[in-house]
Amino acid sequence: MQDLSAVKAFHALCQHKSLTAAAKALEQPKSTLSRRLAQLEEDLGQSLLMRQGNRLTLTKAGEVFAVYSEQLLELANKSQEALQELNNQVTGELTLVVHPNLIRGWLSQVLDEFMQQHSTLKIRLLSQFQHSDEVFEPDLIIWIEHAAPMGYRKERLGYWRYATYASPKYLAHRDKPTHPRELIHHPWIDFIACRRAELELHHPEFGSYSLPALESRLQSDNLAMQADAIAKGRGIGLLPTWFANGFETAHPGSLIPCVNGWQSQPTEINCFYPLGRHPLRLRLFIDALRQARPDEWQ
């Protein structure tokens, strides 16, 4: 059986194609990696890597062993997780991909509390993701709408409903609109996520109204910027009701709902996790997300 630290060194060299980069990734001296690779090659009786210019490439034997090194490391990780679960220990790393508009406020608080409860857990949080990226496989994706990526199960966390808002400063000099048809007479701050040829708004008593696409000097896909522009009195725009209520709580007197009762169709907030059995850290984090869902998302 090969030394696991030597297998890790070989795997890092395969990934980075450079002794310097692999040593940096493992936070180990280059001399240590060289020594472990030499010992592994001696144990196997085969040369695994060769240098071509400034890069390391696999030999034929290296290509064969690279497949098994992946399996050895995966098995080692699974065995470690199984032993830790006996004592309900949460360790390792979670890689999360989260929509930028979900991070501030809600998720940052969930993450902080979860990491306080599990002091040895590491979190890697990203806000950009391409479904076509077959190499990168995050543990969990939290996104607004979207179909489930291949190999992932979808779970709905809740809904956002958008409504129109203005600031008291803006309405101090203009009449407050009472029906969506009046919005065409006001400067419009366009939230790109809701931009359509037309936007369907609904009222529990008055039915539906199709709001045409309106000209806008400012278009943004960032909720914080959208709310700031509205609060500064630049015009009227859409915000999720949950986000607007939180913004108003943090900044009292900054936002006023317009055309009361009219809202967009619900927009799904989903999380996606891999099929199959999950490590304890992921199962507990998914439970934490479920428990932390705001009531306004229902």
UniProtKB/Swiss-Prot annotation:
GO BP terms: DNA-templated transcription
Occurrences of domain HTH lysR-type (ranges): 1-59
Keyword Signal: no
Protein's UniProt keywords contain DNA-binding: yes
Superkingdom of the organism of origin: Bacteria
DNA-binding region: 19-38
Keywords, alphabetical: Activator, DNA-binding, Transcription, Transcription regulation, Virulence
Gene Ontology molecular function, alphabetical: DNA-binding transcription factor activity; sequence-specific DNA binding
PANTHER family, per database record: HTH-TYPE TRANSCRIPTIONAL REGULATOR, IRON-REGULATED VIRULENCE REGULATORY PROTEIN IRGB
Function: Transcription activation of the irgA gene. In the presence of sufficient iron, transcription of both irgA and irgB is negatively regulated by a fur-like protein. In low iron conditions, negative regulation of transcription is removed, and production of IrgB leads to positive transcriptional activation of irgA.
Family from the record: Belongs to the LysR transcriptional regulatory family.
Protein's name in the database: Iron-regulated virulence regulatory protein IrgB
Gene name per UniProt: irgB
